[in-house]
Amino acid sequence: FHWYSSTGWVMWNIQVGGLLSGTTICLFDGSPSGTRDKPDWTRLWSFAARNAVTWFGAGATFFSACQKAGVDLSEIDGLAQVRALGSTGSPLPPDVQRWGTAQFDALGKPDIWWCNVSGGTEIAAAFMAGNPELPDTPGRLQCRHLGAAIEAWDDEGRPVVGEVGELVCTRPFPSMPLYFWGDDHGARYRESYFAQWPGV
């Protein structure tokens, strides 16, 4: 299991948490894009191939940069063992997911599973993620996590389905932050999470 992350991002905690289930994790120390003088967006992919990574994750911007750089994964021997790709940090553009799927199709993996995730460092968890039993549609998250009361709301605070909306968690959950460091009276905390729709 490898998810490219700094130690300050929730994906670091999630990757290390994989050890609890007996997963072997592979850590990469360095720039995924090579150096300023010699950019190389295949570095992280080559690392994954050398270490027989079966689950490969990174921020959506990494996958976008690889597409923009014209990375050809068929030139890297050993990536066919990858069974799943994870993306988070920002929405993964549908064309980038289609690019990645085509790259793995060329490696003989036409049904590579994308686990697109939405969550946050401050909650140390995800609200929405993937399920390999559900359809995998570029530009969409597959499902809510168990126990997460998640809806998309329009500007008036009404739930919407099948259209763009604001991701809203409508009920408390175990890992929600209790306060912000140095925010003694909770003003910043309330403004950040509760101001847009009072009572939610």
Predicted regions and their residues:
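Alpha-helix initiation and N-capping motif
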Residues: W41, A60, L79, P174, ...
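Conserved AMP-binding/adenylation subdomain of ANL enzymes
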Residues: F1, T7-T54, A69
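Short, hinge-like loop/turn segments at secondary-structure boundaries
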Residues: L44-N51, L73-I76, N131-P135
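Conserved phosphate-coordination/catalytic loops
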Residues: T35-P39, A60, G199
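Conserved AMP-binding/adenylate-forming
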Residues: R83-L85, L92-V200
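Short acidic-hydrophobic sequence patches enriched in Asp/Glu that either
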Residues: D40, D77, Q142
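Adenylate-forming
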Residues: S6, D29-P32, N51-W99, C115-E122, ...
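Short, well-ordered coil/turn elements that cap or connect secondary structure elements
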Residues: L20, R50, L79-A80, K109, ...
